[in-house]
Amino acid sequence: MGSKVTGVKIKGIGKYVPEMVATNEDFTKIVETSDEWITQRTGIKQRHITNGEPTYYLGAMAAKAAMADAGVKAEDIDLIIATTVTGDYFTPSLSCLIQREIGAIGCIAFDLNAACAGFVYGFDTAKRYLQTGDGIKTVLLVASEELSKFVDYTDRSSCVLFGDGAAAFVLELSLIHI
């Protein structure tokens, strides 16, 4: 006789990056650097940069892509967790702006602020909500950053590192029989 273990299933994945691309060659025009210097130290060849799109827009586009991939509608979402350090406003939260953009009115929505680890903390939080069995069946987890608006483009050591974009997962509970 086997037992059941509860896990989390990634039902859908989405991403969104702005169209504008900044290459390493572009950075050689604004700071003393070279493509070789950047690539050897970071592995980065290019990064996407917004052209006025707000952080919530990036997140909403990734969310819509994840929902399409999962085959779920806005009304299927029970919880939205958004992670960012570059939100557009102090309030409303990024999650509430994404909630409005995708039409998931009525679900729980909140932000987590944990910088680079935000998506990992968000995944763990989503898992715990799903495992409570308290009505949360589908979670939309979104990480959205627009770091270009805070970059010091005179600091060679950091300006070459950051770009803008968003990723999203649609998560559901999964029972594993072992």
Task: Show where each model-derived region lies.
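Conserved catalytic cysteine-centered active-site region
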Residues: 37-41, 45-57, 85-139
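Conserved small/polar residues in nucleotide/adenosyl-binding loops
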Residues: 176-178
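Short acidic, glycine/serine/threonine-rich loops at helix termini
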Residues: 21-22, 91-93, 151-156
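Flexible, glycine-rich active-site loops centered on histidine and acidic residues
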Residues: 131-166
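Conserved "HGTGT" condensation-loop signature of ketosynthase/thiolase-family condensing enzymes
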Residues: 1-78, 102, 173
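Active-site PLP attachment segment
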Residues: 119-123, 163-168
